[in-house]
Amino acid sequence: MSKNSEFINLSFLLDHEKEMILGVLKRDEYLKKVEDKRIRKLKNELLEAKRRSGKTQQEASRVCVHCHRNLGLIFDRGDPCQACSLRVCRECRVAGPNGSWKCTVCDKIAQLRIITGEWFFEEKAKRFKQVNVLGTDVVRQSILRRSPGAEEVQSQEQTRQDAEKSDTSPVAGKKASHDGPKRKGFLLSKFRSATRGEIITPKTDTGRSYSLDLDGQHFRSLKSPPGSDRGSTGSSDLNDQEPGPRTPKSSRSNGVTPGTQSSPAPSTRTVTSVISREYGFENSMDLAAIEGTSQELTKSHRRNTSGTPSIAVSGTSLSSDQSRSELDLSESFTEDSEDTVSIRSKSVPGALDKDSLEETEESIDALVSSQLSTNTHRLASGLSTTSLNSMMSVYSETGDYGNVKVSGEILLHISYCYKTGGLYIFVKNCRNLAIGDEKKQRTDAYVKSYLLPDKSRNNKRKTKIRTGTNPEFNETLKYTISHTQLETRTLQLSVWHYDRFGRNSFLGEVEIPFDSWNFENPTDEWFVLQPKVEFAPDIGLQYKGELTVVLRYIPPEENLMLPPEQLQGNKTFKKGKKKESPVISGGILEVFIKEAKNLTAVKSGGTSDSFVKGYLLPDDSKATKHKTLVIKKSVNPQWNHTFMFSGIHPQDIKNVCLELTIWDKEAFSSNIFLGGVRLNSGSGVSHGKNVDWMDSQGEEQRLWQKMANNPGTPFEGVLMLRSSMGKCRL
């Protein structure tokens, strides 16, 4: 919010009134995070139900697609669901009105739209103009911003107070100079604590104050020091401001000394001053004085400035206390799946490899392909799109060079410190590991860890190399991350045999999700090492957000009604005889890219700079590529952009595939894949050939069929983004 028109004038509010409003806004922010967490949990439950149900059943199979119960030939044959057309048994049905019924998964999808309140936001979007700025943000920044005439008013107030203080004793002046930073520290600590979700109450008569830690869900009570003017806030942030005669930065920037700014001298505004002092404020300028300190808080109210440990490994970045997953992707981003040499090269088959020679965004993929062309097949399981930062990581993720059979266990002690935000993985030892080097009959093992889905170099931790099949490590791998963020992560620990020539051998791995992990009673626990999963069914089911699109197919007999400038084609400015525009036969596929929700945040401020790229397969040439504009600093972008593909006959609908992928725009590195969808008939066949990109299921397939069966009618659909654009295996 950089425009002045987005601020409202709240200068008439008293100090304690502003404090009360800010407290309400902080509670509102906390409730929003709780609601986002609830919605994310519901959607993860739906994805888990889909995963348990399996993929689309074959025609010859007589098994319930959800519970896998055997169906009979005559009795209890099962019936296809009226929504998804999958055959289910009687136990997996949910009856509806008028004798209709749905399978359990389809019913859960329908209920999810109601439970999460999506219907309300959809109706709101139809009635009111969509804006990217929330009302709470406008009020918060209006309170925190300095009014245009604040400095003039403040200078006049200082002059008047200096005249009144001329008769006071030096002791009183010294006390006032000490009192200013104290009150300033109290005000700043209020904002810091409120950002963490703590509700702070004023000091009571007994000298004790209570604060509710909303993240930890427990009460804390701290005794306020005797004679403290700031009271007790239950937060260690009180120690951040050392009382003393030195001038704070905020005061120096405004040309005001602490003594004059927060002097307890008598004033004509006695009632206001008394009320303000009860809540830790001296005058209305205290709110504006922290503007320089809380500049980042003003720009993003979810940015934590209290010193809460950062999610990013870099110590210079501030943490984001959102409930959604914010990834530290300043260096790179990978998805460890069998389907990706490069996420983009598999996402749009063949197209991005061609584009990489012409566009900066795919240059790293071309470099990877050229350098590792001889080992492309072996690198397919783990090569990152931007893993050139650490070639050692590339080789260690490429697979099992020694064909070692995985065996053994690893002993871990996992703990979390809520006060510092530190995750501690104490790697004690391993036992019964496989032999890494068969010729020398030795194993030089080390342990490597990631907090998935972030597989960047900054997110990697490694132990030292130990010799033997029962190595003793006794090392602690530490991550700094807030608890709300930790609930969205999965710890991946892998054991490797070190080879001096870089041909490391994979010895096993363990994945530990933290969404339901109990950190209250940490204990030592043995984990069995597992082989690397070649076909990872869960990779495609990770919740990456949603994309809202509107599809419409305009048949050939209606496309001549459109003006020529709406048809697909590039304008030319070459001199010479003007060429006639070719007559385009066939219909037009109109794709309206509306918006996306809950995208993965990859920037340090908890946002992304996202855009959508579209292809109509099998034509994956650069000429047919469509892109939207980049929407910056948002995880809920609204593009409202239309893609138009021409020359499509009705019989082509069942042979083509619309692929839409969302990317985060990076200035000096490869763009980061955020998710994608494919819309097609789901037959697996295109023009008589078996292809891996005709793999749509569920809502993707249903939306495509609706469009094909009703030419000329637009259909809107909300599609869950895939976390990997590899083929969905049956």
Swiss-Prot record:
Organism of derivation: Homo sapiens (Human)
Self-association and partners: Binds RAB27A that has been activated by GTP-binding, and possibly also RAB3A and RAB6A.
Gene: SYTL5
InterPro entries membership: C2_dom (IPR000008), C2_domain_sf (IPR035892), FYVE_2 (IPR041282), Rab_BD (IPR010911), SLP-4/5_C2A (IPR037303), SYTL1-5_C2B (IPR043567), SYTL5_FYVE (IPR042783), Znf_FYVE_PHD (IPR011011)
Record keywords: Membrane, Metal-binding, Phosphoprotein, Repeat, Zinc, Zinc-finger
Location of the protein in the cell: Membrane
Modified residues (Phosphoserine): 147
Biased composition annotated in UniProt, kind: Polar residues: 248-271, 305-322
Its job: May act as Rab effector protein and play a role in vesicle trafficking. Binds phospholipids.
Distribution of this protein across tissues and organs: Highly expressed in placenta and liver.
Entry GO CC: exocytic vesicle; plasma membrane
Residue stretches making up the C2 domain: 406-527, 563-694
Coiled coil: none
Classification lineage: Eukaryota, Metazoa, Chordata, Craniata, Vertebrata
GO MF annotation list: neurexin family protein binding; phospholipid binding; small GTPase binding; zinc ion binding
Zinc fingers (FYVE-type) by residue: 64-106
GO biological process entries: exocytosis; intracellular protein transport
S-S bonds: none
UniProt domain RabBD: residue ranges: 7-123
Protein name from the UniProt record: Synaptotagmin-like protein 5
Region of interest: Disordered: 147-188, 217-271, 294-355
Pfam family name, one: FYVE_2
Membrane topology: Peripheral membrane protein
